[in-house]
A protein has these predicted regions:
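Mature extracytoplasmic/periplasmic domains
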Residues: 115, 287, 310-311, 315-398
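Helix-loop-helix "hinge/cap" segment bordering the ligand-binding cleft or interdomain interface
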Residues: 119, 123-124, 137-207, 219-253, ...
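Short helices/loops that flank or line small-molecule/ion binding pockets
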Residues: 82-94, 111-112, 162, 185-190, ...
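Hinge/lid segment of periplasmic solute-binding proteins
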Residues: 102-154, 163, 182-185, 298-305, ...
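N-terminal export leaders
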Residues: 7-8, 162
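C-terminal capping/gating helix-and-loop segments adjacent to ligand/active sites or protein-protein/ligand interfaces
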Residues: 53-54, 370-429, 433
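Extracytoplasmic ligand-binding clamshell segments of periplasmic binding protein
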Residues: 80-84, 217-293, 298-300, 327
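Conserved N-terminal structural module of periplasmic/extracytoplasmic solute-binding proteins
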Residues: 2, 8-107, 123, 327-331, ...
């Protein structure tokens, strides 16, 4: 779930609520596709993915532990991956045995009826696996996809700004200022007042989409009808309030200005300096967003849970239901997603927050992150993952949230009233669901 988790696909949807966004790239690249054809049962596996992360896991860990298995690996950029996978799954011709599924589109496939059930694998490991990834990977009582990691979201804040304006940089104390969504907005006003208007609580209101989504009680669709959870209406109100009161830096996620806020170099439209108090990011955001783009601020950051439990990103592994190599496919998924020995080594090597609870409990007290001034982020992430509900995720989420972000943008920017924006959103979704 590193490399930057094509969560950036989802991120583009969220950021679209405030500006056109060019999402950051990854190390993905195209590769020629291969076919499983009609092979007899064997240990040969064709694996497709959208990220080089899985390739490294197979090459550096799985293959040495399974020297008798020949793996043919193909990688396709995230935005092209569904278009490559869909036709072969639907036709049954040229399907990979095993493939990765990104959070933005995983439920589409989990609900498709085209995946190999993994119930027997899950039955062996269920007591040691985190709940929410398994909830997302399950449908109608069957498990179809398994994830090796969890990606809970947190709030990362500048210690120096917390000391200056809140009087403390202690994560326990700072959490009190952002403990829920209403308190978060109150603190946005407090920061404005104490800083004489130069400190924005976030650089982009789009950062708040995932926490508000995490606060929902209902999914987007119930009985084939759109449901707008109160948390999503509150998100609309928040976006408008933040825009009107200049509580955010008025830049888009993944934009140059968004990154500038991390470095402390953001300026407003009049070229005045702007301080950015915090960023709401998941596990991979620490290593591949903050540390990568603002190395000069190392030691001036800390982390707390923030206003709501949420997750962001992740990769699930699944198999085609018609694979001729079902036993080998299941063994690969079981190893990569659940194996204690492998995941302990992988977690230590990569820093990834794995979903295996045995491994979490064994290693979580051993971490100290210099970028966070020695704070143990790993232990906190493991705790945050416990409060995430994966049962609200649906295959239609990506398209619905794209429509929603467009209407939130129109409302926040004063182009539509809230009523107009909601009515247009409802019309778009109704057409989609028909």
């Amino acid at each position: 779930m590193f490399k930057r988790r094509h969560a950036l696909v989802t991120a583009a949807i969220c950021a679209a609520a405030f500006a056109a966004v060019g999402c950051g790239g990854s190390k993905d690249s195209s590769a020629a596709s291969s076919s499983t054809g009609s092979k007899k049962e064997s240990n040969n596996l064709v694996v497709w993915s959208f990220t080089d992360e899985l390739e490294g896991m197979i090459k550096n860990y799985y293959t040495p532990a399974h020297p008798d298995v020949k793996v043919e690996y193909s990688m396709t950029p995230t935005d092209q991956f569904p278009n490559k996978l869909d036709p072969v799954l639907q036709s049954g011709n040229g399907c990979p045995d095993v493939f990765a599924l990104e959070n933005a589109f995983v439920r589409k496939y989990i609900e498709s009826g085209l995946l190999l059930p993994l119930d027997d694998v899950y039955a062996e490991v269920k007591d040691k696996m985190a709940d929410y990834p398994m909830q997302i990977g399950s449908y109608n009582g069957h498990v179809y996809g398994m994830a090796w990691q969890v990606a809970p979201g947190a709030l990362f804040y500048r210690r120096s700004l917390a000391k200056k304006y809140l009087g403390t940089d202690d994560p326990v104390e700072v959490q009190k200022y952002v403990k829920d969504l209403d308190t978060f907005i109150q603190t946005a006003e407090l920061l404005k007042q104490k800083s004489d208007g130069i400190c924005d609580i976030v650089s982009s209101s789009g950062d708040m989409f995932m926490p508000y989504k995490g606060a929902r009680k209902d999914p987007w669709v119930v009985n084939d009808k759109l449901v707008i959870d109160p948390a999503m209406e509150k998100y609309m109100d928040m976006a408008k309030l933040m825009h009107d009161n200049h509580y955010d830096g008025r830049v888009a996620q993944w934009s140059e200005g968004w990154y500038a806020g991390m470095k402390g170099t953001l300026k407003d439209e009049k070229d005045n300096p702007v301080e950015v108090f915090c960023y709401l990011l998941p596990t991979w955001g620490l290593h591949y967003v903050l540390k990568t783009n603002a190395p000069e601020t190392s030691g001036d950051w800390a982390m707390c849970a923030g206003p709501a439990n949420y997750y962001w990103g992740g990769t699930w592994i699944a198999a085609y239901k018609g694979t001729k190599n079902a036993a080998a496919a299941k063994e690969m998924i079981k190893y990569l997603a659940t194996d204690d020995t492998f995941l302990e080594k992988y977690a230590k090597d990569s820093g990834d927050t794995v979903g295996n609870l045995n491994v979490q409990n064994k290693i979580k007290d051993t971490f100290s992150e210099p970028y966070l001034a020695g704070q143990n982020h790993y232990k906190d992430f493991c705790e945050m993952a416990k409060g995430i509900d994966g049962r609200l995720i649906q295959g239609t989420d990506q398209q619905i949230e794209q429509y929603f972000s467009e209407e939130v943008a129109a409302y926040a920017n004063g182009e539509k009233t809230k009523e107009q924006a909601l009515n247009d959103f409802k019309t778009q979704v109704a057409t989609m669901l028909d």
